[in-house]
């Protein structure tokens, strides 16, 4: 099954004041579906490719007495759930988002994404901004889960971010080449991305000469391909 994909908005206020929409913290991890079926726990990327989970994560999943299929993100060594697609083999994607989130809170053994309703949405936005988070995701509370591109959810980001193909590495200077968009620094000790891999980069704006302003390396996007990068609009 394809995961739900969101469009982007620059106007958070309209969604903050509309009670038809809830707000969730926007995470900056790898999109992942995690399924428990009996004693078997599996994970897949947004394209349906299998992913290997640490034994600790499998152990957490197996603490649930119920089977489930969760949509979420792998971030900072843990899985964070933000939607549920099935419970004990029963498809729940036709349920409204509000009902699915409530059911997920009962079923999921994993941490849930922070969600806020009504007036609490503004407080969540302020909290995420103060923590230097990425932004918020707004979802229609009465909408079913739709795979592929959907209008039932939008993302609002404090900074812009996009995915780029690594064209070269300058390890001596600690920078990653992003083709015609310039270079970003590799700010921490770790495993360098490979040439040809897709990486996520945060930036302030795109300059008049097509370069990224204040780019910051966020991580490798193993859930994306070069074809995905080719279809995005960078502005």
List PLM regions with ranges.
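Nucleic-acid 5′ end/cap handling module spanning
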Residues: 2-48, 109-223
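Catalytic nucleotidyltransferase
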Residues: 50, 56, 60-159, 235
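Acidic, low-complexity intrinsically disordered tails
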Residues: 228-235
């Amino acid at each position: 099954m394809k995961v739900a994909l969101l469009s982007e908005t620059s106007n958070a206020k309209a969604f903050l004041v509309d009670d038809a929409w809830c707000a969730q913290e926007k995470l900056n991890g790898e999109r992942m579906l995690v399924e428990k079926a009996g004693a078997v726990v599996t994970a897949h990327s947004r394209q349906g490719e299998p992913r290997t989970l640490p034994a600790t994560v499998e152990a957490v999943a197996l603490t649930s007495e119920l089977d489930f299929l969760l949509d979420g993100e792998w971030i900072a060594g843990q899985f964070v759930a933000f939607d549920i697609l099935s419970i004990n083999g029963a498809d729940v994607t036709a349920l409204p988002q509000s009902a699915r989130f409530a059911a997920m809170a009962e079923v999921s053994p994993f941490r849930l994404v922070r969600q806020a309703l009504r007036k609490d949405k503004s407080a969540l936005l302020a909290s995420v901004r103060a923590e230097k988070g990425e932004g918020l995701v707004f979802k229609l509370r009465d909408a079913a889960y739709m795979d592929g591109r959907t209008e039932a959810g939008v993302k609002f980001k404090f900074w812009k971010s996009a995915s780029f193909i690594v064209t070269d590495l300058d390890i001596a200077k600690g920078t990653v080449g992003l083709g015609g968009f310039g270079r970003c620094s590799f700010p921490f000790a770790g495993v360098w991305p490979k040439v040809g891999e897709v990486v996520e980069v945060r930036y302030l704006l795109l300059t008049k000469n097509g370069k990224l302003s204040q780019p910051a390396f966020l991580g490798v996007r193993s859930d994306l391909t070069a074809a995905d990068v080719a279809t995005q609009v960078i502005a």
